Amino acid sequence: LSYSCLPGGCPITAFMTDLPAAFFPPTTPPHYSRADFGPDFRWGVSTAAYQTEGSWEAEGKGRSIWDEFVRGRRAIKGRETGDVASDFYRRWPTDLDLMQQLGIPNFRFSTAWARVLPTGTGPVNAKGLDFYDRLVDECLARDIAPWLTVYHWDLPLALQQQGGWTNRAVVGWLADYAQVLARRLGDRVQHWMVLNEPMVFTGAGHLLGLHAPGRRSLGAFLAATHHATLAQAEGGRALRAALPASAQIGTTFSCSYLTPWRAGLPRDERATRRADAILNRLFVEPALGLGYPTAEAPLLNRLERYVQPGDEARLPFAFDFWGVQNYTREVVRHAPYVPLLWANLVGAARRGVPYTQMGWEVFPESLYHMLRQFSAYANAPRLLVTENGAAFPDVVTPAGQVHDVARQAYLQACIGQVLRARREGLAVEGYFAWSFTDNFEWAEGYAPRFGLVHIDYATQQRTVKDSGWWYQQLLAGEVITTIPSLGSTTQKATRC
């Protein structure tokens, strides 16, 4: 083994051989180190404002759609809110110190729109913008590069009251907000992302009603989809106009590798292609000038009612990079009772395969397949994995340790799949783990834990999990053994 004990007090390999084989796909390189990825590969962690900051009404901040959504009805498990979350707004120095201790060189975070512009437009809240100014400075003082996401789902409530993402004016609102941030922070922030996962905030927020603003309307989904697609391009142009020429501008896409429930059955194969068009291609292809994928998903022809003259030319934008955000694969079957899409997903529990606290299948190879799929576009920019991780139940031992071997195994398998992609020549240039700390996981509340750092929400005490110490060792250059990879003779380690 490369090393026997972590600072947390437990062997890296403890009880890993008790995990299902799904954690260790045979395509994973049996050994790797940071050096295998090259000196320019970007390593980091990701968070989001609403999920971590708390201080929801502090120092002039306006209300967001999530501040409203968590109060309106029983939308969140346990009726929990993000009012405090992991208290990052007040405890950011501690968290940045932990990042520095773990050797994490890049930190992706989002800004809270209503903290900067309380009503979404108009006067800037000086204290809110000052917070992000200090955050950027203190990241740089610790040799941590800030990566800023302009919009991570927390639309100001005042804009929602004007229609939010269903109002075409949101395209200009977002662009103006992006320029406010760029003018203040652009001299120090080199990497920018316009939107976080538009498929999620349009679909879960406007079609399924699971996320803010809680709409359940096909029309609202289609309007929000077109406006978000315009906004990702216009937001990119707004940043390009306001930032130094050296700045790198990207955006992020959620994605899942899709396979048919019954391989070779034509109706399941067709259902899988329809689902892929919606879940993986809907926001990607317009950015490349390819338009919406209506051939595979005729439902998207209904977007025409929201398209105005000149929109087709406005949808593309030459991003410097795409953020790929992948957690699982999905299995698709034909569903005659699901109108328009005629498809549904077959859950991991029903299929009898290992799954996470979120109910997502443990399938690290999904990341590799999506990197290949996105790289296959003729004009695709370089790719970075800007989110990847897993939620598993954590237990703090009496000694104050968190032995999260499942998360550690999942991360090392996924990172191995990134290396597999790079060895095949794909332009994958970074990996950001989701997430740095445990946080408020949207409709699921605080139960699912994704963090490398455990949060005791009663005391806000931080405890680095074994996965966090493992990530430190990877970043320090240690050789990682993917245990128990196919053919490995490594035996189960004993506790320290």
Language-model regions, residue ranges each:
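Serine residues within intrinsically disordered or low-complexity segments
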Residues: 2-4, 488
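Active-site region of glycoside hydrolase catalytic domains
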Residues: 17-76, 100, 119-121, 129-400, ...
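Active-site mouth loops of central-metabolism enzymes
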Residues: 77-90
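Catalytic domains of carbohydrate-active enzymes, especially glycoside hydrolases
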Residues: 91-112
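Glycine-rich, proline-tolerant flexible connector loops at the mouths of alpha/beta enzymes
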Residues: 111-124
